[in-house]
Amino acid sequence: MTIFRRTPAGLVASGVFMLGLYAAGAVAYGQPVTNQRVMLINAQTGKCLTIAGGRSTDNNVTALQFDCDGDPSRSWSINATSGGVYQISNAQTGKCLTIAGGRSTDNNVEALQYNCDSDPSRTWRITATGGGVYQISNVQTGKCLTIAGGRSTDNNVTALQYNCDSDPSRTWRIRPAGQ
């Protein structure tokens, strides 16, 4: 039987390691990154969530996946509202992620951007599923954010809502922008 002791040197080394992870921008599992710009990376496709064209501030512009690069439209802000609920707004356009029409619980309804307001369709639950990935589910519809078809690594594939299940395309990595 091996007994591990907590020595002062070991505790210092552990603290330095954890501080290094924090300084490097590692995300603690269980809590989404808030109060900074992040990239939402689909766990299945490895592509970043963005807004079609990347610049329009119009409402109802489709959210889709694209290569993760330095374009500001690939960055999002996750802002806590209350009770574990968040608004997710695009850093380039300032618009909030929502579901088309805001009420349908059908699968395959497009995700898009819209004015940030108090409508529950503009709010999301972000739930850790383990391994550094999260399900992002719409508060109004109860459906999870995913990518159409769930497998394509092509750019410009539409983001939409679908039943929350164990398919990896329904999960997202949340990383500080620029990393």
Predicted regions, residues:
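Lectin-like carbohydrate-binding module/patch detector with strong preference for beta-trefoil
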Residues: 30-179
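N-terminal prepro-regions of secreted/extracellular proteins
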Residues: 1-34
